Amino acid sequence: MSLEPDYNPDFNLGMRTEVQQLNQVLMSSSTGMGFIMLLSGEPGVGKTLTAESVAEEMRQPLYIMSASELGETAVEVEEALEQVLELTSKWNAILLLDECDMFLEARSTSDIRRNRLVSIFLRQIEYYRGVMFLTSNRISDFDPAFESRIHLTIHYPALDIQSRLHVWKTFIQIGHLETKIRDKDLKALAKLELNGRQIKNIVKTARLLCKQERVPLAMEHIQMVLQVKKGSLL
């Protein structure tokens, strides 16, 4: 099953609705059976946030691991995967394997080494009985063998101006702290082609600046961070 979520005018509501739908799918699946979801899209569009929100809603710990940490050889990947899957099963944790593109890409006859890695990865996840999220930065050229092992695929489109506006609002309003940032400032910020992770980090750094100055968060703090990160002011 494949989904492509629409961005809700209310960013928080959209995320809550999506998480509730995922929880319903998980609860309706067979007890004791594994459930694997693929979250695909550019960095910073909400893939990790989705897994974090589902884990929070289900009140289960979330174990996050980058696929690159599994190793490079077949032996390393097999041993690392066995350990991670055993650990998450003991903890009753949800597993998030980040950036799995190297395993998800279609195999070719010219790369025997990589074919072995993919085969091991497929075999290990096939017998997993927990909830697993796989993330990918692209959706094309998947190995056909994954179609029968991935139960749900969600593709996240790149953020547009309206989506970025709500992301800015969401992170700036976290904690309901005092701010001098106005709607026209938010609209100007939304025109910058930044992803959700970049926006989150910019706001976090700006909050540290205003905390040091003991003043409300203002556009000047955001501009200062942008100047350092991008070399230019708005």
Where do the language-model regions lie?
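Conserved AAA+ ATPase small/helical "lid" subdomain
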Residues: I154, H176-Q227
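A short structural micro-motif
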Residues: L3-P5, L208-L209, V228-S232
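Walker A/P-loop NTP-binding motif of AAA+ ATPase domains
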Residues: S2-A188
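C-terminal engagement/docking regions of AAA+ P-loop ATPases
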Residues: D10-S29, K200, L217-L234
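Surface-exposed beta-strand edges and their flanking turn/coil or helix-capping segments
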Residues: I64, V77-E78, W168-K169, K204, ...
